[in-house]
Amino acid sequence: MTAAAEPTAVPVAPPLQVAIYDDVVAARGEQFRIPGLAVTVFAHADDAVAQCLTAGYDVVFMDYALGPGRRVGTEVTRALRAAGFRGKVVAISSDPAANAAIRAAGADSSLAQKALLRSYLVHLGRAPLNP
């Protein structure tokens, strides 16, 4: 009698760590439970540099206007890059000019419409992150 072969465990990649800095998404209480991603939503980005460097986020989605008296997305993106953050930054303002400003401050890309955020996240969860 031949012993059955033990199933080989397939290594599972850890989920991508994703931060979303958007006051409206946070106010709506939106939650993103997407396979392959661990998503955290923040209402403002005042502490984004410390949060991103400590938590090791792979991807950061950054809005421009994050509420009265709060740091704006361009300032935060510039500070992230100056602090050595090497993850991807994606601008998610509904205003194309604001997205362009965030890109000029160091973001890698932008979403044309914030309404596409969930679809983009689903795609990101399915595809490996390119270096």
Report residues per predicted region.
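Non-catalytic signal-transmission and effector/linker regions of two-component phosphorelay proteins
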Residues: 1-34, 38, 115-131
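Short acidic, S/G/P-rich loop/turn micro-motifs used as interaction or catalytic elements
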Residues: 24-28, 65-69, 96-98
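Short, structured coil segments at secondary-structure junctions
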Residues: 34-37, 85, 104-107
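Acidic, metal-coordinating helix/loop segments flanking the phosphotransfer/catalytic sites
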Residues: 41-59, 63-67
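Conserved phosphotransfer cores of two-component systems
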Residues: 53-55, 79-86, 105
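Conserved phosphotransfer microenvironments
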Residues: 60-80
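Alpha4 helix (beta4-alpha4-beta5 surface) of REC/receiver domains from two-component response regulators
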Residues: 71, 94-115, 119
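Hydrophobic/aromatic residues positioned on beta-strands within the core alpha/beta folds
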Residues: 90-92
